[in-house]
Curated annotation (Swiss-Prot):
Catalysis performed (reactions): a quinone + NADH + 5 H(+)(in) = a quinol + NAD(+) + 4 H(+)(out)
Organism annotation: Geobacter metallireducens (strain ATCC 53774 / DSM 7210 / GS-15)
Keywords: 4Fe-4S, Cell inner membrane, Cell membrane, Iron, Iron-sulfur, Membrane, Metal-binding, NAD, Quinone, Repeat, Translocase, Ubiquinone
One GO cellular component term: plasma membrane
One Pfam family hit: Fer4
EC number: 7.1.1.-
Function, in words: NDH-1 shuttles electrons from NADH, via FMN and iron-sulfur (Fe-S) centers, to quinones in the respiratory chain. The immediate electron acceptor for the enzyme in this species is believed to be ubiquinone. Couples the redox reaction to proton translocation (for every two electrons transferred, four hydrogen ions are translocated across the cytoplasmic membrane), and thus conserves the redox energy in a proton gradient.
Binding-site residues for [4Fe-4S] cluster 2, renumbered to this chain: C61, C90, C93, C96
UniProt-listed NCBIfam families: NuoI (TIGR01971), PRK05888.1-4 (NF004538)
Gene3D superfamilies, A to Z: 3.30.70.3270
UniProt main location, coarse: membrane
Cofactor: [4Fe-4S] cluster
Name of the protein in question: NADH-quinone oxidoreductase subunit I 2
Binding site for [4Fe-4S] cluster 1: C51, C54, C57, C100
Length: 131
Protein backbone atom coordinates (compact mmCIF):
# COMPACT_ATOMS: atom_id res chain seq x y z
CA UNK A 1 0.00 0.00 0.00
CA UNK A 2 2.84 2.41 0.75
CA UNK A 3 5.05 1.35 -2.24
CA UNK A 4 2.70 2.71 -4.95
CA UNK A 5 2.59 5.99 -3.03
CA UNK A 6 6.39 6.19 -2.90
CA UNK A 7 6.68 5.33 -6.63
CA UNK A 8 4.18 8.06 -7.50
CA UNK A 9 6.07 10.56 -5.33
CA UNK A 10 9.34 9.60 -7.04
CA UNK A 11 7.87 10.31 -10.46
CA UNK A 12 6.42 13.60 -9.26
CA UNK A 13 9.74 14.76 -7.79
CA UNK A 14 11.60 13.74 -10.97
CA UNK A 15 9.28 15.84 -13.15
CA UNK A 16 9.31 18.76 -10.73
CA UNK A 17 12.99 19.50 -11.43
CA UNK A 18 12.86 19.06 -15.23
CA UNK A 19 13.05 22.02 -17.59
CA UNK A 20 9.51 23.24 -18.37
CA UNK A 21 8.22 22.60 -21.90
CA UNK A 22 5.71 25.45 -21.99
CA UNK A 23 6.76 28.96 -23.05
CA UNK A 24 4.98 32.07 -21.80
CA UNK A 25 4.46 33.18 -25.41
CA UNK A 26 4.27 36.95 -25.59
CA UNK A 27 7.13 37.30 -23.12
CA UNK A 28 9.28 34.35 -24.27
CA UNK A 29 9.72 33.99 -28.03
CA UNK A 30 10.32 30.51 -29.42
CA UNK A 31 13.25 30.13 -31.81
CA UNK A 32 12.22 28.12 -34.88
CA UNK A 33 14.57 25.50 -36.25
CA UNK A 34 16.66 26.36 -39.34
CA UNK A 35 14.42 24.14 -41.50
CA UNK A 36 11.22 25.86 -40.34
CA UNK A 37 8.97 26.90 -43.24
CA UNK A 38 7.41 30.20 -42.22
CA UNK A 39 6.18 33.17 -44.22
CA UNK A 40 7.41 33.68 -47.78
CA UNK A 41 9.75 36.45 -48.96
CA UNK A 42 11.14 37.50 -52.33
CA UNK A 43 14.90 37.95 -52.60
CA UNK A 44 16.38 41.15 -54.02
CA UNK A 45 19.25 41.43 -56.50
CA UNK A 46 20.54 44.81 -57.72
CA UNK A 47 17.58 46.63 -56.10
CA UNK A 48 15.07 44.47 -58.05
CA UNK A 49 13.30 41.24 -57.26
CA UNK A 50 15.24 38.20 -58.54
CA UNK A 51 12.08 36.63 -60.00
CA UNK A 52 12.33 36.04 -63.77
CA UNK A 53 8.68 35.06 -64.06
CA UNK A 54 9.17 31.47 -65.18
CA UNK A 55 5.78 30.41 -63.72
CA UNK A 56 7.25 27.35 -62.00
CA UNK A 57 6.09 28.37 -58.51
CA UNK A 58 2.36 28.69 -59.37
CA UNK A 59 2.58 25.52 -61.47
CA UNK A 60 4.06 23.38 -58.71
CA UNK A 61 1.93 24.84 -55.87
CA UNK A 62 -0.58 22.18 -54.71
CA UNK A 63 -2.81 24.79 -53.05
CA UNK A 64 -2.84 27.08 -56.14
CA UNK A 65 -2.27 30.13 -53.94
CA UNK A 66 0.41 31.89 -56.04
CA UNK A 67 -0.53 34.37 -58.78
CA UNK A 68 2.16 35.72 -61.13
CA UNK A 69 1.82 38.13 -64.05
CA UNK A 70 4.82 38.87 -66.26
CA UNK A 71 6.10 42.15 -67.60
CA UNK A 72 9.05 43.11 -69.83
CA UNK A 73 11.62 45.83 -69.33
CA UNK A 74 13.52 47.79 -72.03
CA UNK A 75 16.06 44.97 -72.58
CA UNK A 76 13.19 42.45 -73.08
CA UNK A 77 13.92 40.72 -69.77
CA UNK A 78 10.91 39.25 -68.02
CA UNK A 79 10.08 40.31 -64.48
CA UNK A 80 7.16 39.74 -62.14
CA UNK A 81 4.84 42.69 -62.60
CA UNK A 82 2.33 41.16 -60.18
CA UNK A 83 3.28 38.53 -57.60
CA UNK A 84 0.75 37.51 -54.95
CA UNK A 85 0.55 34.70 -52.41
CA UNK A 86 -2.74 34.00 -50.65
CA UNK A 87 -1.59 32.90 -47.19
CA UNK A 88 -5.04 31.60 -46.27
CA UNK A 89 -4.72 28.93 -48.96
CA UNK A 90 -1.00 28.25 -48.56
CA UNK A 91 -0.07 24.96 -46.87
CA UNK A 92 3.60 25.99 -46.37
CA UNK A 93 4.93 22.93 -48.21
CA UNK A 94 7.95 24.75 -49.69
CA UNK A 95 7.53 23.36 -53.23
CA UNK A 96 7.60 26.89 -54.66
CA UNK A 97 11.01 27.54 -53.09
CA UNK A 98 12.41 24.22 -54.35
CA UNK A 99 11.10 24.79 -57.89
CA UNK A 100 12.53 28.30 -58.35
CA UNK A 101 15.49 28.13 -60.79
CA UNK A 102 16.97 31.50 -59.76
CA UNK A 103 16.45 31.12 -55.99
CA UNK A 104 14.16 34.18 -55.89
CA UNK A 105 11.80 32.92 -53.19
CA UNK A 106 12.60 31.92 -49.63
CA UNK A 107 10.69 30.92 -46.53
CA UNK A 108 11.53 32.99 -43.47
CA UNK A 109 11.41 31.98 -39.83
CA UNK A 110 8.49 34.34 -39.23
CA UNK A 111 5.41 32.51 -37.98
CA UNK A 112 3.06 35.20 -36.63
CA UNK A 113 0.24 35.49 -39.14
CA UNK A 114 -2.60 37.06 -37.16
CA UNK A 115 -4.70 39.81 -38.82
CA UNK A 116 -8.21 41.21 -38.63
CA UNK A 117 -9.10 41.38 -42.34
CA UNK A 118 -8.95 38.68 -45.00
CA UNK A 119 -7.33 41.11 -47.45
CA UNK A 120 -4.27 41.33 -45.20
CA UNK A 121 -3.52 37.67 -45.85
CA UNK A 122 -2.92 38.24 -49.57
CA UNK A 123 0.77 39.15 -49.71
CA UNK A 124 1.56 41.32 -52.75
CA UNK A 125 5.01 41.78 -54.29
CA UNK A 126 5.89 44.87 -52.24
CA UNK A 127 5.05 43.14 -48.97
CA UNK A 128 7.03 40.05 -49.95
CA UNK A 129 10.07 42.21 -50.72
CA UNK A 130 9.98 43.77 -47.22
CA UNK A 131 10.76 40.52 -45.42
Amino acid sequence: MIMPLINGLKITLKHMFMKPVTLQYPDERPTPSPNFRGLHALKVSHSKAKCVCCYLCPTVCPAKCITVEAGEDQEHNKYAERYEIDMLRCIFCGYCVEACPVDALKMTGEFELANYKREDFVFVKERLLEK
